Amino acid sequence: MTAGTEIALYLIQNLGTLLLTLIALRGMLHASRANFYNPISQLIVKITNPLLAPLRGVLPAKGRIDWAVLVMAVLIQIIILLGIAWLVGERWSLPNPLTLVGWGIIGVLGLVTNLTFFVLIAMIIISWVAAGSQHPAIELIRQIAEPIMSPFRALLPNMGGIDFSPILLFVTINIVQIGLRHA
């Protein structure tokens, strides 16, 4: 692999993952019904709107699911996969389109589980360090984490003032990640 190919591969992977992360965060903001007037939410919306606007007319959001975000995330993941395949010389041995869509869905699910993991870690650290803070980032993390945590809190309520539900969520995230690795 030449230096130019390696640089191009690095850029495709990292810039593609950054864009995919912003799109996934936009979907998580919508699903959690986070405050869209939060400055960080506004930044994510302004960055992702040019990509999502063409799909909005065809795929409107229904309830907590933003279909335009889901389709765009899978498309970006497929473009990343095709770019990597093209760079490493696998231009002519690409799988059929349904397999590519499957890989795209698995990639997006993997990213969302990783984002959920990091949101949960951030939520735990914030609860120790800055429990009462009103910083926009902290508020956004709380708003994203609460809908994810609430079903686990119902299964495992506080015991003596200590919340053990994140442990159950960590176990669930790990099970999902193992399943995605073997899909």
Language model region names:
Residues 1-183:
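Selective transmembrane helix interface/packing segments
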